[in-house]
């Protein structure tokens, strides 16, 4: 009689940065029976493939200070742990994988209280508070950036990189764009991750005329929360809320302007795309600046602080790079050197080693 397939619960919720690496891992474990743990009305309800049944729980993060709201959250956390324990026991799961965030706490506590192994993936250069607290409890902590290990001295750390979506690795990276971009013209791609970046959008629109005059085209992925997304009209400017074929778009790009979330940086690295990075200033513990530092110190990107940034500064930095093709080429090479293209395979192998032994 054949052995029953391994059953794995993946706890990943909230943003593309948490979800895309988890989906990439799941695709590398076709022999596993995988279910998902998420939160109602979050991005996972749209992104997680239907082949992975989605279980949802109510969970919140902790804010500064302690008061009645914290007591309420503690109560909800306790209820979430009980609910995850029920899911794990009823589903006969043999392990848990998580990418952090609010969902990780109840997932790790519930799994470890039942004696189940947990693999935690941390994609950022500065591990989040949840990772720093729960990392030592886990069977292994997989790191996207090697520098993160110094913040997790008591965890069992393994650097595997951060998995990217399959489109970045399966040949789509060289597929043609279905956008009206002439061959040979400089292309600036602006994107703010899965949540967009309204402040960056405004600066780009104010800067773009000089780029058009220099012959560049701009593909601007504005997200879906920018009320002025359609305010700029120009034949060399394409504004879209999102674009599905990001691999081909970044491969074609002469230069990217981006936030520095770990997922976005991983995609830039795999494509070898030089970038100007504008870290999101309100990210938890300013972790996007730590991510950007990895790329800047490697010569793969230029980092500009949003608090000091004006349209004129952004405009001139872009023009300087467009006029320096050798510098752009070197930045692209350095970005590609950071990439771990087989990250999903390495992470899947780690999960197998932890769960099956």
Swiss-Prot record:
InterPro entries recorded: GlcNAc_MurG, Glyco_trans_28_C, GlycoTrans_28_N
N-terminal signal peptide: none
Name of the top EC class for this enzyme: transferase
Primary localisation category: membrane
EC annotation from Swiss-Prot or TrEMBL: 2.4.1.227
GO molecular function: UDP-N-acetyl-D-glucosamine:N-acetylmuramoyl-L-alanyl-D-glutamyl-meso-2,6-diaminopimelyl-D-alanyl-D-alanine-diphosphoundecaprenol 4-beta-N-acetylglucosaminlytransferase activity; undecaprenyldiphospho-muramoylpentapeptide beta-N-acetylglucosaminyltransferase activity
One Gene Ontology term, aspect cellular component: plasma membrane
Pathway(s) per entry: Cell wall biogenesis; peptidoglycan biosynthesis
Membrane topology note: Peripheral membrane protein
Residues that coordinate or bind UDP-N-acetyl-alpha-D-glucosamine: 15-17, 124, 165, 194, 288
An annotated GO BP: cell wall organization
Subcellular location(s) per record: Cell inner membrane
Keywords: Cell cycle, Cell division, Cell inner membrane, Cell membrane, Cell shape, Cell wall biogenesis/degradation, Glycosyltransferase, Membrane, Peptidoglycan synthesis, Transferase
Catalytic activity from the UniProt record: di-trans,octa-cis-undecaprenyl diphospho-N-acetyl-alpha-D-muramoyl-L-alanyl-D-glutamyl-meso-2,6-diaminopimeloyl-D-alanyl-D-alanine + UDP-N-acetyl-alpha-D-glucosamine = di-trans,octa-cis-undecaprenyl diphospho-[N-acetyl-alpha-D-glucosaminyl-(1->4)]-N-acetyl-alpha-D-muramoyl-L-alanyl-D-glutamyl-meso-2,6-diaminopimeloyl-D-alanyl-D-alanine + UDP + H(+)
Protein function: Cell wall formation. Catalyzes the transfer of a GlcNAc subunit on undecaprenyl-pyrophosphoryl-MurNAc-pentapeptide (lipid intermediate I) to form undecaprenyl-pyrophosphoryl-MurNAc-(pentapeptide)GlcNAc (lipid intermediate II).
Family as reported in the entry's similarity comment: Belongs to the glycosyltransferase 28 family. MurG subfamily.
NCBIfam families: murG
HAMAP family the UniProt entry points to: MurG (MF_00033)
Protein name: UDP-N-acetylglucosamine--N-acetylmuramyl-(pentapeptide) pyrophosphoryl-undecaprenol N-acetylglucosamine transferase
Organism per entry: Nostoc punctiforme (strain ATCC 29133 / PCC 73102)
